[in-house]
């Protein structure tokens, strides 16, 4: 009798150990790095009391497991999810830009979908010669673990404006899907400036005012040599990409609308990626303190983007804003024509 109990106990410990390892591997594969997200704490349960922050990743894991099961339930009942199915896949979709257009927000929101797995950091494989020289296998090993049915997505906004990138991505996968999130060009340029300004101030360095950078003092015209201005000429960059990819492989996300009405934009992306609709209004809630939408995984696990998001922009001379919008207008019209999406920017 004692021998049977010992055997039973060893078997039970083996099963529990396997479950613990499995949970850890799945957590790494699906939840990924939380470095750019900040938990809302304390999180109150509907049953009362605040949950320990250390419990939150496990609760999120349990919720996402349920979503993954829902996504896979159309398969044969004989098919099971096994840990050995986990692989590091090359991305099937890439958010290629635009810087300060909302790339991080888009990636984190898409990660709500059970069929999406995100690369937690910007890889900078295609825009960095040193990284690119390491080869495609190095790039693949930078990807998170996922199941074959899932889509791995990475984002590196520098891809959009870097000349060599379209050809390099084409050589990897000529049928890849490309996401471009854009904002009103002048607003985006000011946001770009604001991020650089904040970095200078942290180092106690002085920096020119936006007006002096955006307007050429010699000609009083828009300074197209200023990177923040050049980046906002979306059509110039897109034309370079269209030499390698048809327009059907691009999806334009309205970054301004993603801030105010994220769900319709996310539903369009789901359709573009041929994903079943899984993201709902339940997954998104407006945080009045931060002034933008945050993510809800379940009733106790909520996340907001890091505090660096939603920076307050400096006041800019209205005449400069008018001049910039007049400058961008013809480029915007061409962008609408090429993409088939009118964004009604001023």
From Swiss-Prot:
GO terms for cellular component: Golgi membrane. SUPFAM superfamilies: P-loop containing nucleoside triphosphate hydrolases. Gene3D superfamilies: P-loop containing nucleotide triphosphate hydrolases. Keywords: Disulfide bond, Glycoprotein, Golgi apparatus, Membrane, Signal-anchor, Transferase, Transmembrane, Transmembrane helix. Substrate binds at residues 122-128, 155-158, 226-227. It catalyses: alpha-D-glucosaminyl-[heparan sulfate](n) + 3'-phosphoadenylyl sulfate = 3-sulfo-alpha-D-glucosaminyl-[heparan sulfate](n) + adenosine 3',5'-bisphosphate + H(+). 3'-phosphoadenylyl sulfate binds at residues 100-104, 183, 191, 293, 309-313. InterPro entries: NST/OST, P-loop_NTPase, Sulfotransferase_dom. It is a single-pass type II membrane protein. It is found in: Golgi apparatus membrane. Residues 33-346 are lumenal. Its EC number is 2.8.2.23. One of its GO terms (biological process) is negative regulation of coagulation. Disulfide bonds join 294-304. Residues 1-12 are cytoplasmic. Glycans are attached at residues 75, 173, 204, 287. Pfam families: Sulfotransfer_1 (PF00685). Belongs to the sulfotransferase 1 family. This is Heparan sulfate glucosamine 3-O-sulfotransferase 5. The lineage of its organism: Eukaryota, Metazoa, Chordata, Craniata, Vertebrata. The gene is Hs3st5.
């Amino acid at each position: 009798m004692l021998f049977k109990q010992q055997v039973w106990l060893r078997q039970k410990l083996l099963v529990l150990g396997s479950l613990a390892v499995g949970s850890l591997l799945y957590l790494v594969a699906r939840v990924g790095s939380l470095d750019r997200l900040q938990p809302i704490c304390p999180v109150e349960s509907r049953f009362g009391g605040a949950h320990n922050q250390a419990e939150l990743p496990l609760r999120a894991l349990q919720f996402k497991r349920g979503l993954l099961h829902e996504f896979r339930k159309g398969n044969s009942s004989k098919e099971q999810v096994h840990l050995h199915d986990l692989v590091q896949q090359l991305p099937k979709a890439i958010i290629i830009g635009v810087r300060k257009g909302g790339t991080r927000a888009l990636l984190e929101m898409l990660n709500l979908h059970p069929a999406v797995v995100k690369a937690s950091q910007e890889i900078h494989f295609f825009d960095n010669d040193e990284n690119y020289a390491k080869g495609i296998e190095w790039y693949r090993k930078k990807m998170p673990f996922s199941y074959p049915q899932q889509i791995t997505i990475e984002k590196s906004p520098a891809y959009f404006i870097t000349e060599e990138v379209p050809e390099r991505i084409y050589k990897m996968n000529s049928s890849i899907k490309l996401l471009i999130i854009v904002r009103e060009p002048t607003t985006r340029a000011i946001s770009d400036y604001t991020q650089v300004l904040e970095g200078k101030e942290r180092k106690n360095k002085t920096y020119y005012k936006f007006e002096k950078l955006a307007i050429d003092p010699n000609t009083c015209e828009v300074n197209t040599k200023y990177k923040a201005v050049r980046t906002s000429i979306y059509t110039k960059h897109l034309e370079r990409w269209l030499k390698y990819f048809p327009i059907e492989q691009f999806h334009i996300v309205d970054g301004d609308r993603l801030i105010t009405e994220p769900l319709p934009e996310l539903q369009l992306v789901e359709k573009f990626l041929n994903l079943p609709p899984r993201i709902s209004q339940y997954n998104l809630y407006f945080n009045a303190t931060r002034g933008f939408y945050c993510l809800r995984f379940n009733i106790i696990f909520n996340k907001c983007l890091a505090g660096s998001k939603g920076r307050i922009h400096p006041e800019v001379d209205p005449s400069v804003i008018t001049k910039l919008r007049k400058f961008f207008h013809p480029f915007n019209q061409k962008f609408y024509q090429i993409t088939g999406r009118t964004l009604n920017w001023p």
